[in-house]
């Protein structure tokens, strides 16, 4: 009799076990659903936007070889400049005798084009995920505003160097056709201004408590810079009677 009681008791224990006992999520990983359903995690994800910004003080930056520059190489930057360690004659990417001098294929180590579009894809993906995010509206607005701001910043830097560039607004998968045509300079400016308009509407005012994060004032500053660039002689023939870009 006791033997049968043990069997019945064991059966009850087994039947009481959770069916998903062996279907546990990895404890060392988070899914996208986890990230975009939590404001703190979504903010941490958006923090990576700041790592996309181009570092203007690295030894690879071509602007670092001018007499007025701050050059980061080894120890003292001023010492490197003062000692003429790098000049237009010694810097290989400006030396015409060194495989053709400076052009796009000679500065691939800067990764300006690749890093910009890598960041743009990252931001586009973030914007898609944030549309269905259940986090609080205030958090959602500010994070979305940051994404629009950084996309505008990246495109602003691109058009300064290349003029019109392809405008990528979607997230492409491995099997998608992703060849894009080059937009005109004016089309790029209009696209960037639209992103900055959204950024200004969504970003919060300046707050010392979050010093260093994008805010409404910074978006306005970039907008002013962009419109000055668009109206400059660099992108407008000074002899042209037509008005400059707005």
Which functions belong to the PLM regions below?
Residues 148, 220-226:
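TPR/Sel1-like alpha-solenoid repeat signature
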Residues 1-27:
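Bacterial Sec-dependent N-terminal signal peptides
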Residues 159-160, 166, 229-238:
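Short coil/turn linking the two alpha-helices of tandem helical-hairpin repeats
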Residues 43, 51-61, 82-162, 177-190, ...:
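Conserved, well-structured interaction surfaces
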Residues 27-31, 170-176:
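Short linear capping/connector segments at secondary-structure termini
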Residues 17-71:
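Membrane-proximal, proline-rich intrinsically disordered regions
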Residues 169-172, 234-246:
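Acidic, serine/threonine/proline-rich low-complexity intrinsically disordered regions
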């Amino acid at each position: 009799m006791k033997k049968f009681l043990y069997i019945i008791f064991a059966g009850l224990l087994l039947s009481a076990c959770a069916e998903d006992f062996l279907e546990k999520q990895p404890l060392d990983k988070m899914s996208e659903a986890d990230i975009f359903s939590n404001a703190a995690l979504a903010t941490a994800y958006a923090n990576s936007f700041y790592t996309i910004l181009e570092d203007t003080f690295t030894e690879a930056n071509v602007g670092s070889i001018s007499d007025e520059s701050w050059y980061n190489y080894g120890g003292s930057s001023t010492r490197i400049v003062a000692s003429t360690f790098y000049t237009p004659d010694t810097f290989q990417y400006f030396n015409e005798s060194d495989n053709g001098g400076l052009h796009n294929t000679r500065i691939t180590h800067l990764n300006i084009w690749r890093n910009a579009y890598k960041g743009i894809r990252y931001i586009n993906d973030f914007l898609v995920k944030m549309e269905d995010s259940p986090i609080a509206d205030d958090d959602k607005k500010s994070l979305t505003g940051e994404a629009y701001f950084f996309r505008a910043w990246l495109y602003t830097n691109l058009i300064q160097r290349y003029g019109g560039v392809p405008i990528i607004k979607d997230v492409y998968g491995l099997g998608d056709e992703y060849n894009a045509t080059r937009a005109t300079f004016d089309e790029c400016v209009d696209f960037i201004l639209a992103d900055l308009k959204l950024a200004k509407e969504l970003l919060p005012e300046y707050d010392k408590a979050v010093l260093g994060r994008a805010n409404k004032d910074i978006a306005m500053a970039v907008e002013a810079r962009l419109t000055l660039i668009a109206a400059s002689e660099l992108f407008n023939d000074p002899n042209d009677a037509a008005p400059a870009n707005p």
